[in-house]
Amino acid sequence: PLRLVGSEMCIRDRIYCWRGGQRSSSFATILSEIGWRPSLVDGGYKNYRNDVTQLLHKTKPPYQFILISGHTGTAKTEIVNILNEFSLQTIDLEGLANHRGSVFGATATKQSSQKLFESRLFTRLQSLDPRKPIILESESNKIGQLAIPSMIWNIMKLSPRIEVNAPLNERAKYLTTTYADLILSLIHI
């Protein structure tokens, strides 16, 4: 049986099937009958993936990036996330890829698939104003096993950078705090 918990019955995610046909629209009808407000992906997943591929791999997106760069341990990801809290446009590529991005690598949970990473990046880009710069951390063309999509990578290579510097001892302190889980796992080996 279907159970609804909470007072607000609303689906904010979009519903799709392969081509956007009767399966997704039938399910959306059922959900709307029980009080939810679903939206459908026009043309289904096939059309959605085409939009993702077009933006990330085939046409030059209309975005301007500013990259935060620096050595490991200079809190670049943290800086990007703090700037986001101040309502600046940011993208946390490592967060979207579920990876630390540095030499310390993987998180405790499995890394996303390439398609999921691209979908997350596409969704994030669609939520931002292309007329304003977007701040993101400088990365290599891969984050763990995932490749930064070619058009995004091409923009990143030409983007202005803000270099973050910190003394080695401060970086070491930051790393031992931020990556404490890795230190503990090494102790248990």
Predicted segment positions?
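Catalytic cysteine-centered active loop of the rhodanese-like fold, especially the PTP/DSP P-loop
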Residues: 8, 12-41
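Phosphate-binding P-loop
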Residues: 56-63
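Conserved phosphate-donor/acceptor-positioning beta-strand/loop module used by diverse small-molecule
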Residues: 156-175
